[in-house]
Design a protein with these regions (language model features):
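Extreme N-terminal basic, low-complexity initiation segments
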Residues: 1-12
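Generic short N-terminal amphipathic or hydrophobic helices
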Residues: 6, 26-27, 31
């Protein structure tokens, strides 16, 4: 007590507490804390299963496509110019993908009736880059509910919260995701690259090799490095026919004509 003044012990106010940082998967929007989790399947994981209605009838993925490679890809919206150019290219290349043992499956968050009307318009009215009367016969998923798009992490809120980005999932015959490519809404895909990645993955699996930068079919492949000192010594003393070693860990070779023909046959 100091005269008429009472001095009380200091108590830390609740307003002085250290700020509590929200979890990393939590965002604060308009003063409301909302938990938002965005699950994105990763390379090497099993592709998530789903059932869906498509322009080719109902599908069960991956059960309906056992033993096949699959390109599962999303586009932002029907009746848009960049997506139209892509679907014309996918349609024109569909037989090429079939020869590679690969099934195309498209997706957007549009309805089945929208898909059908759009594909009909592409076939009957659109001409682009020398392509016309393109008849798209691979499945295009009705995903108005955004179920599949969310399952595969195709909705990127920073780009759009209501449209899928241009995602491409390369899925092998065992339903394992082997590669993923994303493009933004305004940029159409590079179809030569899509084909290169598919052929590259098939080459890797068939011949147990790796592929160097900018590899294209017919280029040299990278052979496995020695795993022991004995193997390293054998490689230096008796290099395999057709193998060029740039150093002990970096050796390449050309696929033989028989191997290249085997790839062409599929």
């Amino acid at each position: 007590r100091n005269g008429n003044r009472v001095i009380r012990p200091f108590r830390r106010s609740v307003f002085c507490k250290d700020p509590v940082r929200p979890p990393s998967d939590t965002i604060i929007k308009k003063g409301i804390m909302e938990n938002q989790t965005h699950s994105v399947p990763r390379i090497g994981e099993k592709a998530p299963a789903f059932t869906a209605s498509t322009t080719q009838g109902p599908i069960r993925f991956p059960d309906d496509f056992k033993g096949k490679w699959v390109l599962l890809f999303s586009h932002p919206a029907d009746f848009t110019p960049v997506c139209t150019s892509e679907f014309m290219t996918f349609g024109a290349m569909s037989r090429d993908f079939e020869r590679l043992g690969c099934q195309l499956i498209g997706l957007s968050v549009d309805s089945l009736s929208s898909h059908l009307a759009w594909l009909h318009t592409i076939r009957e009215r659109i001409e682009f880059n020398g392509m016309k009367n393109v008849d798209v016969r691979f499945p295009l998923i009705d995903d108005v509910s955004m179920h599949v798009a969310t399952l595969y992490g195709m909705i990127h809120p920073g780009e759009s919260g209501t449209k899928a980005v241009r995602a491409v999932f390369f899925i092998d015959p065992d339903a394992v995701i082997r590669a993923i490519i994303y493009y933004p809404l305004a940029l159409g895909r590079n179809f030569d690259e899509l084909r290169r990645v598919l052929v590259g993955l098939q080459t890797i699996d068939r011949f147990h090799v790796s592929l160097p930068a900018d590899w294209r079919p017919g280029d040299e492949v990278v052979v496995p490095s020695p795993g022991t000192m004995d193997a390293l010594d054998r490689q230096e003393e008796h290099p395999a026919d057709g193998v060029t070693c740039h150093d002990w860990f970096f050796c390449t070779r050309k696929l033989t004509e028989e191997e290249q023909q085997e790839m062409a046959i599929g």
